[in-house]
């Protein structure tokens, strides 16, 4: 197991390079509504986030649109959202459940965007109002939300984040879509809502050395397994 810390003092960003091979995991990247961009994009960016987090909202408002325009919409990066509610219960968990329940009806991203845009109105009545405005089946949504049907999956996401060493939100992982992290091209962990330029620098570096051959996309859940026993912690 190897690791190298690189400090970028100008932007106060710490990058942790993890050089373990990927281990087997479950799930499929193609059946998860929390993915934006092409499945064939050479780079995958995973965000661990909380709908109540101010810095997460800052990323959503200021940085994600630029990443979307330059990398996601152009087929260079696929973007994966993972839940990291900072508390075990409360608004953050409720919002994550609401987004998942909307996703069950094929409207994850509209709800995701609405929740980050309406952070002063994160309550059960508002969630159900958003679902109605989106044309969702209100009975199905209400049942899903009231029964907290996605709690286990939400907290599995949070466990992934802590395995990477994240102790706050947002946190980001950059990995190769095909093959996952290797010693030659490790995963890059980026803690915090760093400027767009920091994301662009790392993405461009990975794109410049991206292999031309294509294989099966790496499952984001599988890639996170490489950090489960890592001694490297991000602060």
What is the role of each PLM region?
Residues 62, 129-235:
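C-terminal cap of thioredoxin/glutaredoxin-like
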Residues 22-24:
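Signal peptide processing junction and immediate N-terminal pro/mature segment
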Residues 1-10:
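Bacterial N-terminal signal peptides that target proteins for export
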């Amino acid at each position: 197991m190897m690791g190298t810390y690189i400090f970028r003092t100008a932007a106060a960003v710490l990058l942790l390079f993890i050089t373990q091979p990927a281990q087997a995991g479950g799930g499929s990247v193609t059946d998860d509504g929390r993915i934006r961009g092409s499945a064939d994009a050479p780079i995958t960016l995973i965000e661990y986030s909380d709908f109540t987090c101010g810095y997460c909202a800052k990323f959503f408002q200021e940085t994600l649109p630029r990443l979307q325009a330059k990398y996601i919409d152009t087929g260079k990066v696929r973007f994966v959202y993972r839940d990291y509610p900072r508390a075990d219960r409360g608004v953050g968990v409720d919002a994550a459940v609401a987004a998942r329940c909307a996703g069950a009806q094929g409207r994850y991203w509209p709800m995701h965007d609405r929740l980050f845009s309406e952070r002063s109105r994160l309550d059960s009545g508002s969630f159900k109002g958003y679902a109605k405005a989106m044309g969702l089946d209100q009975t199905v949504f209400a049942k899903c939300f009231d029964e907290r049907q996605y709690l286990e999956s939400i907290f599995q996401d949070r466990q992934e984040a802590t395995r990477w060493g994240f102790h706050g939100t947002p946190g980001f992982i950059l990995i190769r879509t095909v093959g996952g992290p290797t010693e030659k091209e490790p995963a890059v962990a980026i803690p915090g809502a760093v400027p767009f330029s920091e994301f662009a620098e790392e993405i461009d570096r990975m794109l410049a050395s991206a292999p031309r051959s294509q294989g099966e996309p790496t499952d984001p859940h599988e890639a996170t397994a490489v950090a489960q026993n890592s001694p490297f912690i991000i602060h």
